């Protein structure tokens, strides 16, 4: 996909770097596979802000994505590729031989007219969804389940992928892009290939308004606030004179907050392991 740098016709266009894809569908999404998406502006049921920096943005329709890929043995054809405002990856509309249509995360390299299959007997090619027991060791995969039948949870964003590095007994070991090595049950499904739109990380929005269109509100530095609003607030000049903390007083910048979980035993190697 071409990466386009715009001419500086205005201050807001000067730094914009866009990623274009001429093969994407220009029209509306399939109505039967869309749902209403209600925004909450980062507020909970009491109206209090629970997630900062959210609010506004363009109205969006949610595209219902098939993360389970359960139509085994029924061949499908890629009818079109589409933009999805709810994720960084592109999506593909599949038309199955029985007439049903479903959206999936579009794998890199898949184009309109390509055949897509799922199930234990699916061919080993990009876009096929199989249990990990049927995927050759060394293969690059995405949209990986963590529990059999729950649906894909790992490696779903633009350009994401993982590699099957081993298979022993009931578990397969996958290496994530972060460097983490993780065990997953061999009954869990994964899709061959990597996720489309890998150039997404090259995109430069160019102005604050482009983030506001996406529902992202400004982030104010704690040192620019008053003492009543943040532990870093107040004082003369720019120094806040203490160890950096969050707005709620928890140490930050290196302080570990992750609690141990039952599933830690599935992590073979941490992403930050030396």
Swiss-Prot record:
Q: Which domain of life is it from?
A: Bacteria
Its GO biological process terms?
cytoplasmic translation
A GO CC annotation given for this chain: large ribosomal subunit
What keywords appear on the UniProt entry? Ribonucleoprotein, Ribosomal protein, RNA-binding, rRNA-binding
Q: Which InterPro entries match?
A: NA-bd_OB-fold, Rib_uL2_dom2, Ribosomal_uL2, Ribosomal_uL2_bac/org-type, Ribosomal_uL2_C, Ribosomal_uL2_CS, Ribosomal_uL2_dom3, Ribosomal_uL2_RNA-bd_dom
Q: How does it assemble?
A: Part of the 50S ribosomal subunit. Forms a bridge to the 30S subunit in the 70S ribosome.
Query: Which cysteines are disulphide-bonded?
Result: none
Please list the GO terms describing molecular function. Answer: rRNA binding; structural constituent of ribosome; transferase activity
Against Gene3D superfamilies, the record matches this protein to: 2.30.30.30, Nucleic acid-binding proteins, Ribosomal protein L2, domain 3
Q: What does this protein do?
A: One of the primary rRNA binding proteins. Required for association of the 30S and 50S subunits to form the 70S ribosome, for tRNA binding and peptide bond formation. It has been suggested to have peptidyltransferase activity; this is somewhat controversial. Makes several contacts with the 16S rRNA in the 70S ribosome.
Protein name per the record? Large ribosomal subunit protein uL2
Gene encoding it? rplB
Q: Where is this region: Disordered?
A: 221-256
Q: Does the keyword Nucleotide-binding apply?
A: no
Q: Which family does the record claim for this protein?
A: Belongs to the universal ribosomal protein uL2 family.
